[in-house]
């Protein structure tokens, strides 16, 4: 029995019985109180019903208490504060969670929230101008793990990478590759400021020299540019794909911005918005304070972005008449919606925080308020090596690449560490700390817990084979798991699916890492108690019944840790 789901259903039934209303009760929350003094679980249903029925919340709570106290798994109910209903669950109901994990594993880990949601999540979308740096890895891991979580709770998810292959940075890339091409032909070159001086582009020049000789130099500029652009973008994308694959990340779609121009999708989108009355000719408001010399006060085509909550309307054309980057964003969102997405998630870097309102406006307009949109910002990664910050810049050629860090510590450490802080908070990544074998290193601490559970089961199989066979046959008495430490671990195990659901609901993958660290901590504490007090050991040869129950507990811990690591794309370790 999933206690959280069962209580939610019983609250809905009680709401229908007491107030002939189950829809409002369905929005009520079931949470674990921060203070155990307030019971095992808490619900705000009384306050929600009270607001609707214009009744005092405590009066509503008392009526719920009269109905719910009769449930067989409820030990006690207390009313707290303005009307919170706090539940204490009977120990045997918590203990039964272990049986659910071990004997009904597939059902326990299965979550089905809403199969009607078709989510498109765009993440990484790094400009294809060079190797990915460690800052990109944070958005990559966040987006990939969020996609995994959403798939785990049964949403249909498309993972997408937007290839910015139509902007000025691509022009700079082409110019740099052409210089490297000339260098490969024997010409002395200087990389001007503003281009890409990194040595990673030298092989591209050599490949072009080998394939074309000096033929590119005899072509007209447009023909030469087209060939080099196609070649350079594809090579850089191959590099990025490999970096991502080495992190365990694979997108379903790589979508080209240039294709929006080539297929006329931008013009088509603008015409649609004109028919909707959302494009007009006007001037942008002057910047607040001192007028900036680059402020463009010309009459131009603008999108009515302010109608949907943006701070100002947005230009769709540049001064030279070409489409703005914003116009590409409009067409791209339209394309996603036409492909069937009814929920768009954008994962952006800290340097794009100003894009949130404009993206929301785009989707609200084109989705006609029927398509959900969420824009998540991943803050900076402060990369530290031996305590010294490393500044990263593609243009200067001195950045810590994903490839370098992956080679140094491995993908599992990168993936886990990127989830050790909420995405909208800066994160310090210290190469020294992530390689320590101590409780100060969270990935080691969690993996070590998994290894220890495997060790417990292996030891039991070796020392007490007959009892181990009974354990595998499900012959254990879970009521023997009655110590405070055991019940706390069991409650945490039972809350795994609740944690997964919350991670999906709030788009917070870090909850999974935090949960695993917490579970590992409680398990290690009990293990250490066993060193001081033999009664807390998992394998007690003189007490086979208790050993059987604790083998069940250890196995449940192992399965939940493995499930959590699988969700975040980390391989559970069986030995160290």
Curated annotation (Swiss-Prot):
A GO molecular-function annotation: ATP binding
Subcellular location per the Swiss-Prot or TrEMBL entry: Cytoplasm
Enzyme class: ligase
GO cellular component labels: cytoplasm
Annotated keywords: Aminoacyl-tRNA synthetase, ATP-binding, Cytoplasm, Ligase, Nucleotide-binding, Protein biosynthesis
Motif 'HIGH' region per record, residues: 126-136
UniProt-listed InterPro entries: aa-tRNA-synth_I_CS, Arg-tRNA-ligase, Arg-tRNA-synth_N, Arg-tRNA-synth_N_sf, ArgRS_core, DALR_anticod-bd, Rossmann-like_a/b/a_fold, tRNAsynth_Ia_anticodon-bd
Cited Pfam families: Arg_tRNA_synt_N, DALR_1, tRNA-synt_1d
A GO biological-process term: arginyl-tRNA aminoacylation
CDD domains named among the record's database cross-references: ArgRS_core
Known EC number: 6.1.1.19
Catalytic activity from the UniProt record: tRNA(Arg) + L-arginine + ATP = L-arginyl-tRNA(Arg) + AMP + diphosphate
Keyword Signal (UniProt): no
Keyword Nucleotide-binding part of the UniProt annotation: yes
Record family assignment: Belongs to the class-I aminoacyl-tRNA synthetase family.
NCBIfam families with a match to the protein in the record: argS
Subunit structure: Monomer.
UniProt name for this protein: Arginine--tRNA ligase
């Amino acid at each position: 029995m999933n206690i959280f789901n069962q209580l939610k259903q019983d609250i809905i039934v009680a709401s229908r019985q007491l107030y002939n209303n189950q829809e409002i009760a369905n929005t009520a929350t079931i949470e674990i109180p921060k203070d155990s003094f307030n019971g095992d679980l808490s619900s705000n249903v009384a306050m929600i019903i009270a607001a609707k029925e214009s009744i005092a919340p405590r009066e509503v709570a008392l009526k719920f208490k009269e109905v719910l106290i009769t449930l067989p798994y409820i030990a006690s109910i207390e009313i707290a504060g303005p009307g919170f209903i706090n539940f204490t669950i009977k120990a045997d109901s918590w203990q039964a969670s272990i049986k659910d994990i071990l004997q009904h594993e597939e059902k326990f880990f299965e979550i089905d929230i809403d199969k009607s949601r078709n989510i498109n999540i765009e993440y990484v979308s790094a400009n294809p101008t060079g190797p990915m740096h460690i800052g990109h890895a944070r958005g990559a891991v966040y987006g990939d793990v969020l996609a995994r979580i959403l798939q785990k709770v049964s949403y249909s998810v498309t993972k997408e990478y937007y290839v910015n292959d139509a902007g000025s940075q691509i022009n700079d890339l082409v110019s740099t590759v052409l210089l490297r091409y000339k260098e490969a032909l024997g010409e002395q070159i200087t990389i001007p400021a503003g281009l890409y001086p990194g040595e990673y582009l030298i092989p591209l020049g050599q490949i072009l020299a080998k394939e074309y000789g000096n033929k590119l130099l005899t072509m007209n500029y447009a023909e030469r540019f087209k060939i080099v652009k196609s070649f350079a973008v594809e090579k850089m994308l191959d590099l990025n794909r490999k970096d991502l694959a080495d992190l365990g990340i694979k997108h379903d779609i790589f979508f080209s911005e240039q294709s929006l121009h080539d297929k006329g999708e931008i013009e088509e989108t603008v015409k649609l918005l004109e028919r909707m009355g959302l494009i007009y000719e006007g001037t942008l408001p002057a910047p607040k304070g001192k007028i900036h010399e680059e402020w463009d006060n010309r009459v131009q085509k603008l999108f009515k972005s302010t109608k949907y909550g943006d701070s100002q309307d947005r230009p769709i054309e540049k001064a030279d008449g070409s489409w703005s980057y914003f116009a590409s964003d409009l067409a791209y969102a339209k394309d996603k919606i036409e492909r069937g997405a009814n929920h768009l998630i954008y994962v952006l870097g800290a340097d794009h925080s100003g894009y949130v309102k404009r993206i929301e406006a785009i989707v609200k307009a084109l989705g006609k308020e029927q398509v959900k949109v969420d824009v998540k910002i991943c803050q900076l990664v402060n990369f530290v090596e031996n305590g010294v910050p490393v500044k990263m810049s593609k243009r200067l050629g001195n950045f810590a690449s994903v490839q370098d860090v992956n080679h140094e510590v491995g993908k599992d450490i990168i993936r886990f560490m990127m989830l050790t802080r909420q995405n909208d908070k800066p994160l310090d990544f210290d190469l020294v700390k992530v390689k320590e074998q101590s409780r100060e290193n969270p990935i080691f601490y969690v993996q070590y817990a998994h290894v220890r559970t495997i060790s417990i089961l292996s030891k039991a199989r070796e020392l007490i084979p007959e009892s181990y066979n009974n354990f595998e046959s499900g012959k254990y008495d879970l009521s023997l798991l009655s110590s405070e430490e055991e019940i706390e671990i069991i409650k945490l195990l039972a809350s795994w699916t609740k944690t997964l659901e919350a991670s999906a609901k709030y788009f917070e993958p870090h909850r999974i890492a935090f949960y695993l660290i917490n579970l590992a901590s409680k398990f290690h504490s009990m293990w250490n108690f066993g060193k001081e007090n033999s009664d807390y050991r998992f394998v007690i040869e003189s007490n086979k019944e208790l050993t059987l129950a604790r083998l069940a507990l250890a196995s449940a811990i192992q399965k939940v840790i493995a499930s959590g690591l699988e969700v975040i794309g980390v391989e559970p370790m069986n030995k160290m």
